[in-house]
Protein backbone atom coordinates (compact mmCIF):
# COMPACT_ATOMS: atom_id res chain seq x y z
CA UNK A 1 0.00 0.00 0.00
CA UNK A 2 1.43 3.38 -1.01
CA UNK A 3 1.63 6.35 1.34
CA UNK A 4 -0.89 8.16 -0.84
CA UNK A 5 -3.35 5.29 -0.57
CA UNK A 6 -2.75 5.07 3.16
CA UNK A 7 -3.47 8.74 3.71
CA UNK A 8 -6.56 8.44 1.54
CA UNK A 9 -7.82 5.55 3.67
CA UNK A 10 -7.52 7.51 6.90
CA UNK A 11 -8.83 10.77 5.44
CA UNK A 12 -11.83 8.97 3.95
CA UNK A 13 -12.69 7.54 7.36
CA UNK A 14 -12.40 10.96 8.96
CA UNK A 15 -14.45 12.57 6.20
CA UNK A 16 -17.23 10.03 6.70
CA UNK A 17 -17.23 10.78 10.41
CA UNK A 18 -17.19 14.51 9.74
CA UNK A 19 -20.17 14.28 7.40
CA UNK A 20 -22.16 12.32 9.98
CA UNK A 21 -21.37 14.80 12.76
CA UNK A 22 -21.73 18.08 10.88
CA UNK A 23 -18.83 20.54 11.18
CA UNK A 24 -17.54 19.18 14.49
CA UNK A 25 -13.90 18.06 14.47
CA UNK A 26 -14.32 14.28 14.01
CA UNK A 27 -11.33 13.57 16.25
CA UNK A 28 -13.23 15.13 19.14
CA UNK A 29 -16.11 12.66 18.80
CA UNK A 30 -16.19 8.98 19.75
CA UNK A 31 -17.44 8.05 16.29
CA UNK A 32 -14.68 9.98 14.57
CA UNK A 33 -11.95 8.52 16.78
CA UNK A 34 -13.32 5.01 16.25
CA UNK A 35 -13.35 5.53 12.48
CA UNK A 36 -9.76 6.77 12.52
CA UNK A 37 -8.67 3.90 14.78
CA UNK A 38 -10.23 1.30 12.49
CA UNK A 39 -8.64 2.91 9.43
CA UNK A 40 -5.22 2.87 11.08
CA UNK A 41 -5.66 -0.79 12.01
CA UNK A 42 -6.67 -1.67 8.44
CA UNK A 43 -3.65 0.22 7.15
CA UNK A 44 -1.30 -1.55 9.56
CA UNK A 45 -2.66 -4.96 8.64
CA UNK A 46 -2.25 -4.07 4.96
CA UNK A 47 1.42 -3.30 5.52
CA UNK A 48 1.83 -6.49 7.56
CA UNK A 49 0.38 -8.61 4.75
CA UNK A 50 2.96 -7.06 2.43
CA UNK A 51 5.74 -7.96 4.84
CA UNK A 52 6.43 -4.30 5.63
CA UNK A 53 6.54 -4.68 9.40
CA UNK A 54 8.37 -1.41 10.06
CA UNK A 55 5.69 0.53 8.19
CA UNK A 56 2.93 -1.43 9.91
CA UNK A 57 4.04 -0.20 13.33
CA UNK A 58 3.32 3.46 12.57
CA UNK A 59 -0.46 3.26 11.94
CA UNK A 60 -0.88 0.57 14.60
CA UNK A 61 0.80 2.83 17.15
CA UNK A 62 -1.57 5.63 16.13
CA UNK A 63 -4.52 3.27 16.55
CA UNK A 64 -3.37 2.42 20.08
CA UNK A 65 -2.93 6.10 20.91
CA UNK A 66 -6.62 6.48 20.11
CA UNK A 67 -7.67 3.27 21.88
CA UNK A 68 -4.90 1.66 24.00
CA UNK A 69 -6.92 -1.44 24.89
CA UNK A 70 -8.20 -2.22 21.39
CA UNK A 71 -7.90 -5.97 20.82
CA UNK A 72 -7.44 -5.86 17.04
CA UNK A 73 -4.67 -3.24 17.18
CA UNK A 74 -2.81 -5.10 19.92
CA UNK A 75 -3.21 -8.44 18.12
CA UNK A 76 -1.92 -6.96 14.87
CA UNK A 77 1.07 -5.44 16.65
CA UNK A 78 1.70 -8.81 18.30
CA UNK A 79 1.89 -10.36 14.82
CA UNK A 80 4.33 -7.64 13.77
CA UNK A 81 6.66 -8.41 16.67
CA UNK A 82 6.19 -12.14 16.15
CA UNK A 83 7.32 -11.71 12.54
CA UNK A 84 10.30 -9.64 13.67
CA UNK A 85 11.24 -12.34 16.21
CA UNK A 86 10.65 -10.12 19.23
CA UNK A 87 8.93 -12.73 21.45
CA UNK A 88 8.68 -10.66 24.63
CA UNK A 89 6.95 -7.77 22.84
CA UNK A 90 4.71 -10.16 20.89
CA UNK A 91 3.67 -11.91 24.10
CA UNK A 92 2.97 -8.57 25.77
CA UNK A 93 0.64 -7.42 23.01
CA UNK A 94 -1.14 -10.77 22.73
CA UNK A 95 -1.92 -10.52 26.44
CA UNK A 96 -3.17 -6.96 26.01
CA UNK A 97 -5.35 -8.07 23.10
CA UNK A 98 -6.97 -10.73 25.29
CA UNK A 99 -7.27 -8.60 28.42
CA UNK A 100 -10.73 -7.35 27.48
CA UNK A 101 -12.13 -10.80 26.64
CA UNK A 102 -11.48 -14.04 24.79
CA UNK A 103 -11.45 -13.99 21.00
CA UNK A 104 -11.00 -17.32 19.21
CA UNK A 105 -8.99 -15.83 16.35
CA UNK A 106 -6.57 -14.06 18.69
CA UNK A 107 -6.37 -17.10 20.98
CA UNK A 108 -5.49 -19.30 18.01
CA UNK A 109 -2.82 -16.84 16.85
CA UNK A 110 -1.43 -16.60 20.37
CA UNK A 111 -1.38 -20.38 20.64
CA UNK A 112 0.52 -20.58 17.36
CA UNK A 113 3.05 -18.07 18.68
CA UNK A 114 3.50 -20.05 21.91
CA UNK A 115 3.89 -23.26 19.88
CA UNK A 116 6.65 -21.62 17.84
CA UNK A 117 8.36 -20.66 21.10
CA UNK A 118 8.29 -24.27 22.30
CA UNK A 119 5.85 -23.43 25.09
CA UNK A 120 3.62 -26.38 24.30
CA UNK A 121 1.56 -26.57 27.50
CA UNK A 122 0.76 -22.86 27.28
CA UNK A 123 -0.05 -23.21 23.59
CA UNK A 124 -2.34 -26.15 24.27
CA UNK A 125 -4.25 -24.15 26.88
CA UNK A 126 -4.80 -21.26 24.46
CA UNK A 127 -5.93 -23.58 21.66
CA UNK A 128 -8.37 -25.21 24.08
CA UNK A 129 -9.84 -21.80 24.86
CA UNK A 130 -10.17 -21.03 21.15
CA UNK A 131 -11.88 -24.39 20.51
CA UNK A 132 -14.61 -23.52 22.99
CA UNK A 133 -16.07 -21.05 20.47
CA UNK A 134 -18.42 -23.31 18.50
CA UNK A 135 -19.12 -20.58 15.94
CA UNK A 136 -15.49 -19.77 15.09
CA UNK A 137 -15.23 -20.41 11.32
CA UNK A 138 -11.65 -21.76 11.56
CA UNK A 139 -12.42 -24.14 14.42
CA UNK A 140 -11.16 -27.15 12.45
CA UNK A 141 -7.72 -25.53 12.30
CA UNK A 142 -7.78 -25.01 16.04
CA UNK A 143 -8.28 -28.75 16.57
CA UNK A 144 -5.53 -29.41 14.04
CA UNK A 145 -3.27 -27.18 16.13
CA UNK A 146 -4.33 -29.02 19.28
CA UNK A 147 -3.31 -32.27 17.59
CA UNK A 148 0.09 -30.92 16.59
CA UNK A 149 0.67 -29.63 20.11
CA UNK A 150 -0.36 -32.96 21.63
CA UNK A 151 2.27 -34.63 19.44
CA UNK A 152 4.90 -32.27 20.82
CA UNK A 153 3.73 -33.29 24.28
CA UNK A 154 4.22 -36.96 23.28
CA UNK A 155 0.54 -37.85 23.58
CA UNK A 156 -0.28 -39.63 20.33
CA UNK A 157 -3.69 -40.85 21.51
CA UNK A 158 -4.78 -37.31 22.36
CA UNK A 159 -3.38 -36.06 19.07
CA UNK A 160 -5.50 -38.57 17.15
CA UNK A 161 -8.62 -37.38 18.97
CA UNK A 162 -7.94 -33.81 17.96
CA UNK A 163 -7.08 -34.62 14.34
CA UNK A 164 -10.23 -36.74 14.09
CA UNK A 165 -12.29 -33.81 15.39
CA UNK A 166 -10.61 -31.47 12.90
CA UNK A 167 -11.55 -33.80 10.05
CA UNK A 168 -15.12 -34.12 11.28
CA UNK A 169 -15.40 -30.35 11.08
CA UNK A 170 -13.60 -30.14 7.74
CA UNK A 171 -12.76 -33.27 5.76
CA UNK A 172 -10.26 -31.37 3.64
CA UNK A 173 -7.58 -30.57 6.19
CA UNK A 174 -4.36 -31.78 4.51
CA UNK A 175 -2.14 -31.61 7.56
CA UNK A 176 -4.62 -33.47 9.76
CA UNK A 177 -4.99 -36.15 7.07
CA UNK A 178 -1.23 -36.62 6.78
CA UNK A 179 -0.80 -36.78 10.54
CA UNK A 180 -3.58 -39.36 10.85
CA UNK A 181 -1.99 -41.38 8.05
CA UNK A 182 1.37 -41.31 9.84
CA UNK A 183 -0.08 -42.13 13.26
CA UNK A 184 -2.10 -45.02 11.81
CA UNK A 185 1.00 -46.32 10.00
CA UNK A 186 3.04 -46.15 13.20
CA UNK A 187 0.34 -48.23 14.92
CA UNK A 188 0.48 -50.73 12.03
CA UNK A 189 -3.09 -49.87 11.07
CA UNK A 190 -2.20 -49.91 7.40
CA UNK A 191 -5.66 -49.86 5.82
CA UNK A 192 -6.82 -46.64 7.53
CA UNK A 193 -3.32 -45.23 7.01
CA UNK A 194 -3.68 -45.77 3.27
CA UNK A 195 -7.16 -44.23 3.29
CA UNK A 196 -5.96 -41.08 5.04
CA UNK A 197 -2.94 -40.91 2.76
CA UNK A 198 -4.99 -41.20 -0.42
CA UNK A 199 -7.35 -38.48 0.80
CA UNK A 200 -4.31 -36.30 1.48
CA UNK A 201 -2.87 -36.78 -2.02
CA UNK A 202 -6.15 -35.74 -3.63
CA UNK A 203 -6.12 -32.28 -2.06
CA UNK A 204 -2.48 -31.40 -1.37
CA UNK A 205 0.89 -31.49 -3.15
CA UNK A 206 3.40 -34.08 -2.05
CA UNK A 207 6.25 -33.16 0.28
CA UNK A 208 9.25 -35.09 1.54
CA UNK A 209 7.37 -36.54 4.48
CA UNK A 210 4.35 -37.65 2.46
CA UNK A 211 6.51 -39.21 -0.25
CA UNK A 212 8.37 -41.29 2.33
CA UNK A 213 5.12 -42.39 3.95
CA UNK A 214 3.61 -43.19 0.55
CA UNK A 215 6.62 -45.31 -0.41
CA UNK A 216 6.39 -47.17 2.89
CA UNK A 217 2.68 -47.83 2.43
CA UNK A 218 3.23 -49.02 -1.13
CA UNK A 219 5.86 -51.46 0.15
CA UNK A 220 3.46 -52.77 2.82
CA UNK A 221 0.83 -53.43 0.15
CA UNK A 222 3.42 -54.91 -2.22
CA UNK A 223 2.93 -52.20 -4.86
CA UNK A 224 6.51 -52.15 -6.10
CA UNK A 225 5.91 -49.77 -8.99
CA UNK A 226 4.30 -47.18 -6.73
CA UNK A 227 7.02 -47.56 -4.12
CA UNK A 228 9.72 -47.06 -6.76
CA UNK A 229 7.91 -44.08 -8.30
CA UNK A 230 7.55 -42.30 -4.97
CA UNK A 231 11.14 -43.11 -4.09
CA UNK A 232 12.33 -41.53 -7.34
CA UNK A 233 10.28 -38.42 -6.66
CA UNK A 234 11.80 -38.20 -3.20
CA UNK A 235 15.30 -38.52 -4.68
CA UNK A 236 14.64 -35.94 -7.39
CA UNK A 237 12.80 -33.33 -5.33
CA UNK A 238 14.26 -33.76 -1.84
CA UNK A 239 17.72 -35.37 -2.24
CA UNK A 240 19.32 -33.85 0.87
CA UNK A 241 16.50 -34.37 3.32
CA UNK A 242 16.33 -36.68 6.34
CA UNK A 243 13.33 -38.32 4.66
CA UNK A 244 15.39 -39.35 1.63
CA UNK A 245 18.20 -40.59 3.86
CA UNK A 246 15.66 -42.66 5.78
CA UNK A 247 14.24 -44.00 2.51
CA UNK A 248 17.71 -45.07 1.38
CA UNK A 249 18.38 -46.81 4.68
CA UNK A 250 15.22 -48.89 4.24
CA UNK A 251 16.08 -50.17 0.77
Residue ranges and their predicted role:
Residues 36, 70, 103-104, 137-139, ...:
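Residue-level recognition of tetratricopeptide repeat
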Amino acid sequence: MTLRAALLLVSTALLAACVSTGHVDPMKTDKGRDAARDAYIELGIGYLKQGATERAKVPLKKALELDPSNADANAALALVFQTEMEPDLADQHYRKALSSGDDARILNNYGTFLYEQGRYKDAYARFQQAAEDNLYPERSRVFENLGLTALKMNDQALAKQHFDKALRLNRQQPLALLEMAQLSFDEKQYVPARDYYERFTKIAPQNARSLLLGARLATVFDDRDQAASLGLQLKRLYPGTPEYQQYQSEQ
